[in-house]
């Protein structure tokens, strides 16, 4: 007897949808972790799924959250319980990228989809587990995390359920401690890695959502992630400085307590905690010194602080062993003077923002490659292209397969609608847009608009007719993907570009998003892509048309555009980017 899911996958010429669970390794793992045949939750498999999500990133946290929300509403209670168990593991092990997904309005609406408008006399086990989960999130990531502003909808759902009469269980301190942030000293590289992961997840959600204020925020974030501003490094250094100051205050407090006439002062809970904090942090000192060796002031300060910590640890151990005479000969110096801090232009400019209603769309990856020429020339040309990044709009691919997600329950935070199309107007203060993905424009919105600069994937209404026969030009070719442009001139000021994408690998390419940018003196308008998925070895499997306005026919210098493409192949996120010089047309 054949398995009900053991059918082949047929790719028709109908509009392409996202690959089904059968072809997605993550969704297969989730289905296996929630299967009815399990006697109890499979913790090893659940942790394996968490590791998989942390490794893959990209769309993985989002795909997992959507799949789990649906499984939690399964009519089989065993499946729902296993899904909630897996959800708990992912929340506690996958960090901000997954927290961002559970804070979405649609996810929360789907989570409580089976809750009646008024509380039942007795909660079901599923309802109790869901209320417990929301209470845990409310008491931890909504209050104590560094990105708590992004968790607004969790707070709203907690407040709404309470208003409806639902009672939340009391959560033990030990359970809450797992999700509360730990104030451990980290090196700059560790901090920057965490920042990059969080920023990549935030950027995907900003792009997918497509509201003007979010896209402006995405522009700022893209600028930082692309390395045009060094705020990640600045913030990492400030975080180190802040944690060191806290440790120094702890060191001084421990020193005062060990100097106390009370001979048993070393053995109380506070002293033990201070001793533990210093002992755990000390191995990081050497790593920070290695990474920050060019900062002589920081290195010297750390070396001095390390000597003080060694003295304190030795004094603590002597008192613990009853050798108070030897301990009295050790007098560590006072160390809690604040370190000198650096400051950056955008130190406080980028915060993880409060997301409102979100709608479904694919995500991008966050690996970086650069195809520019010499570093100096590339930096000059790219900075000329980029400048400040402002108004843009976004386009969401078809989401028919998620149409009912987050809808239909008695308790909802509000209707979720796709972001409306956004048009940009010329503004002398705006310099350029990096990263605009457009919502398809309605037929009535036919007025031509000029962007102030650099739009990636701006929606537009097709203009009619071309005056020059298009010639195809190779833009880039990698082992997986070939990109070509057909470039023609419509008028003395308008260039038409049609992009073609060919899959050079035998594996399907999915979640492809192409971003394009032009100098700030010009305006870019792009139609939505023909698709975001193509089968292996598909020639011209995806195409996209667009126009560049305010492009003079005989420019004084060659027109350069910056392009970037994100896609998934073999369950791996890929990104390619470069600056391309258009041939004169």
Swiss-Prot record:
SUPFAM superfamilies with a match to the protein in the record: Clathrin adaptor appendage domain (SSF49348), ENTH/VHS domain (SSF48464), GAT-like domain (SSF89009)
Substitution effect: residue 564 to Q: Reduced binding to ENT3 and ENT5
Keywords noted in UniProt: Coiled coil, Golgi apparatus, Isopeptide bond, Protein transport, Transport, Ubl conjugation
Domain GAE positions: 466-581
Impact reported for residue 560 to Q: Reduced binding to ENT3
Keyword Manganese: no
Residue ranges occupied by any GAT domain in the UniProt entry: 196-321
Residue ranges, annotated region (Disordered): 358-378
A cellular component annotation (GO) from this entry: trans-Golgi network
Pfam families associated with the record: Alpha_adaptinC2 (PF02883), GAT (PF03127), VHS (PF00790)
Cell location: Golgi apparatus, trans-Golgi network
Protein origin, superkingdom: Eukaryota
InterPro entries, per database record: ARF-binding, Clathrin_a/b/g-adaptin_app_Ig, Clathrin_app_Ig-like_sf, ENTH_VHS, GAE_dom, GAT_dom, GAT_sf, VHS_dom
Effect of residue 563 to A: Reduced binding to ENT3 and ENT5
Keyword Metal-binding: no
Cross-link for Glycyl lysine isopeptide (Lys-Gly) (interchain with G-Cter in ubiquitin), residue positions: 180, 287
Residue ranges of every copy of the VHS domain listed in the record: 33-169
Leader peptide range in chain numbering: none
Purpose: May play a role in the regulation of membrane traffic through the trans-Golgi network.
Quaternary organization: Binds to ARF1 and ARF2.
Matching PANTHER family: ADP-RIBOSYLATION FACTOR-BINDING PROTEIN GGA1-RELATED
Note: Present with 2270 molecules/cell in log phase SD medium.
Protein name as it appears in the record: ADP-ribosylation factor-binding protein GGA2
The species this protein was found in: Saccharomyces cerevisiae (strain ATCC 204508 / S288c)
